[in-house]
Design a protein with these regions (language model features):
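Short C-terminal tail/terminal secondary-structure segment
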Residues: 2-7, 99-102, 153, 232, ...
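Canonical Rossmann dinucleotide-binding motif of NAD(H)/NADP(H)-dependent dehydrogenases/reductases
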Residues: 8-40
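Active-site helix of classical SDR
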Residues: 128, 164, 172
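Residue(s) in the substrate-gating loop at a strand-loop-helix junction
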Residues: 148
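Alpha-helical segment proximal to the catalytic Tyr-Lys
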Residues: 133, 177-181, 240
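Substrate-binding pocket helix/loop in short-chain dehydrogenase/reductase
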Residues: 103-105, 109-117, 212
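C-terminal substrate-recognition "lid" of short-chain dehydrogenase/reductases
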Residues: 128, 140, 220-249, 253-254
Length: 256
């Protein structure tokens, strides 16, 4: 992993990535580091430490802070640790999330609903709250919240996820308007199908995989690195006038 490129320059900048242990978060953490940023991974998954080790062993700079985004004090600690270690906060990719066990709404256990909302919505709210407080102190920053095309359309069987992701988009738009004049840009990302550990069971089943590929205009799923590239673009100066928007990366799925 060569940590050099001229496409983006995030040298001396600091980024938080929640859910950075695996999948899209891992790819984004590595890409940030490759382009010069110092990266803090916040995750409950101890694999986050391995991602930071990979970055550090290849000339980058990263740290892992075990974080449950449902817990205000842990999120507050994540931001405080980053500021204490690296001196500030420029970018945040709020990516931590879970998928519910598929079930029709009337059969859904309340505890399952609460769990998805707590991680996928409240977690984003808490991260934004403490990230924005720090960015206000330092004169600005960029936040990207990972939503989903499920935040724009719906799929049966995952009502809590659909509800949470719709709300993340609304939260992103509202906050973008509140802080635009304080030089904080906030956007939502809406990936389509991405091949990650979270979706691995779909791709391991030939019949499910076949149906998914048949339903994809490009005939394939995205790789995590393709989503990570959009995150870095939105954080870069190339997107300096973009705020309060939803950026869809779904291989054309919602164009139909």
């Amino acid at each position: 992993m060569a940590l050099n490129s001229t496409q983006f320059n995030f040298a001396d900048r600091v980024a938080i990535v929640t859910g950075g242990a695996t999948g899209i978060g891992r790819a984004t953490s590595i890409l940030f580091a490759r382009h010069g940023a110092r990266v803090a991974i916040g995750d409950l998954n101890p694999e986050g430490a391995k991602t930071t080790e990979l970055i550090n062993s290849n000339g980058g700079e990263a740290l892992f802070v075990k974080t449950d985004v449902r817990e205000p004090e842990q999120v507050k600690n994540l931001v405080a640790t980053v500021v204490k270690t690296y001196g500030g906060l420029d970018y945040a990719f709020n990516n931590a999330g879970i998928l519910p066990v598929a079930a029709p709404l009337a059969e859904l256990e309340e505890a399952r609903f609460d769990e998805v909302i707590a991680v996928d919505l409240k977690g984003v709210f808490l991260c934004m709250k403490y990230e924005i407080r720090q960015m206000l102190k330092s004169g600005g920053g960029v936040i990207v919240n990972n939503a989903s095309i499920a935040g724009m359309i719906a799929d049966p069987g995952i009502a809590p996820y659909v509800a949470a992701k719709h709300a993340v988009i609304g939260l992103s738009k509202a906050a973008a308007l509140e802080y635009a004049r304080q030089k904080i840009r906030i956007n939502a990302l809406a990936p389509g199908l991405v091949e990650t550990g979270m979706t691995k069971h779909w791709f391991d089943d030939p019949s499910i995989r076949g149906a998914l590929m048949a339903n994809s205009p490009m005939g394939r799923a995205a790789q995590p690195e393709e989503i990570a590239g959009m995150v870095l673009f939105l954080c870069s100066d190339f997107a300096s006038f973009a705020t309060g928007q939803v950026f869809v990366v779904d291989g054309g799925y919602t164009a139909r």
